[in-house]
Structure formats: C-alpha cells, structure tokens
A protein has these predicted regions:
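Exported/periplasmic ABC-transporter solute-binding proteins
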Residues: 4-55, 62-65, 69-240
Length: 240
C-alpha cells in the first residue's frame, strides 16, 4: 500500500467531541496507509465557518446537520459523499467523586443541584452543537430559565467536560462519548431523546486536490470495523 500513500497531508476537520475516538482510528494501519493525516479539532461551528471562508480541508465531520448544511451551501462538498456517520446521547455529568443524585425529567431541580453558587458547564448554546442540544433539552423540560444565568459556557464540548473533570463546576452537560472517555467524571443521568433533536454526526468530503484519498478515508470511517471502535467510545454507528 505504500505506493498509494500521498505526499501531502490529508486535512480532516472534526468536531471536538470526536477526538478520543478519531485519534485511535487515525493510528490504525489501514488509515496510516493512506498517508499523513492531520486532524483539526474544534467546535463544528468554528470549522464550518473556516470552510465557508475558503480554508483548505479534505474531510469534514460535524456534530450536527445545521453546520454541515452551511458547508453544503458553499458548494464545496464532493457530490455523493455526504452521509450520517454517527449518533450520540446527551448526559448530565458530575465530578467522579461528587455525591449529586438527580433524575432528569420535566421540571427537575437542576438549579438546586448546582448549590448556592455552582455553575453549569455547557458548550456555547448560541453556536456549538452540544450547547444547542443542551439548551433545547433544558427548555423542553422546563428548566432552562432557572439555570440560564448560571452557565459556565465553553468554546466546545471538550472544554465543558474539562470544567467538570477538574471540579471547577459541580455539573455539566456533554455527550455520552465525552463521559466515556474521561474517568474523572460520572454520568448522573441521560437526557430523554425526546427532549432534543437527534444527535447526528454527518460527514462529507470537501473539494480539494486529492478527493481520492478523502474518499478512501471516508470509506474506512464508514466500515463496520471502525464503527465498532466508535461504539467503544460511546457513539452510535449509523452505518451498517
């Protein structure tokens, strides 16, 4: 396979929540055979805006469909390559040594669980997918107004995870996959899927000088073997 490797780096733009799983996958021999790969992890909103403004990229994996739609509107997606790669769940987390016990449901006392001066760590609800899902879920359950002034907003979901892992905040809302990858936190409860839109990670190749290599990587990411790796990291594989 060495003769098929490309000389320049394949540039992947990926939602920050994918980092633990994707780092493992990128190190696998079948992926390394493609050639050098660089992954830029950030909030999907930030990555989509970069692509929209002409930043070079070969593959984009977003944490929601809205930001993939923004990229598609630029005309830069390779025809026939967009698809839904992964699913996820939204969870309420606390530091692993914390004692908070809380059942998520309509009107649940999230503000009370934060204590007198505790804040709730979430990704920015105005633009970052994890924060948008969190706000939608809390609004659906009737508790958003009680905590909206007590947020510890983060630039992406992995930063929100770190707030809780370091016990800077008593509670946070992240993806299930984030909690799986961080032993310093525990899941307090999972938000009902009906409280927010389905959490979908779409993927697409971006027009570039080496669409062939991007297609090869996309095929590997959509394989059952790699789907099993994603599942170990807390994602739902949406490919057969």
């Amino acid at each position: 396979m060495a003769g098929c490797a490309r000389a320049s780096e394949l540039l992947v733009f990926a939602a920050a929540s994918l980092k633990p799983a994707l780092d493992t996958i990128i190190s696998q021999p079948q992926v390394r055979a493609i050639g050098p790969i660089e992954v830029s992890y950030a909030a999907s909103s930030q990555l989509a805006r970069q692509i929209e403004h002409g930043a070079p990229a070969d593959l984009f994996i977003s944490a929601d469909e809205d930001w993939m739609n923004v990229v598609e509107a630029t005309g830069r997606i390779v025809a026939g390559t967009r698809g839904n790669l992964l699913g996820n769940a939204l969870v309420l987390i606390a530091p692993a040594q914390g004692t908070v016990q809380l059942r998520i449901g309509a009107g649940f006392d999230l503000a009370g669980a934060l204590g007198a001066d505790g804040r709730l760590a979430i990704a920015s609800p105005d633009s970052v997918p994890a924060g948008k899902y969190a706000r939608a879920a809390l609004t659906s359950l009737g508790v958003w107004d009680s905590v909206a002034s007590r947020l510890a907003p983060a630039p992406h979901v992995r930063a929100a995870l770190r707030f809780v892992a370091s016990a800077e905040t008593p509670l946070g809302i992240v993806y299930r996959s984030d909690a799986v990858s961080e032993p310093r936190v525990r899941v307090v409860d999972t938000f009902p899927p009906s409280s927010h839109a389905p959490i979908i990670y779409p993927v697409a190749a971006i027009e570039s000088d080496d669409v062939g290599s991007a297609r090869r990587l996309l095929g590997i990411l959509e394989s059952a073997q790699v789907g099993a790796v994603f599942q170990r990291y807390g994602f739902d594989s949406l490919k057969p």
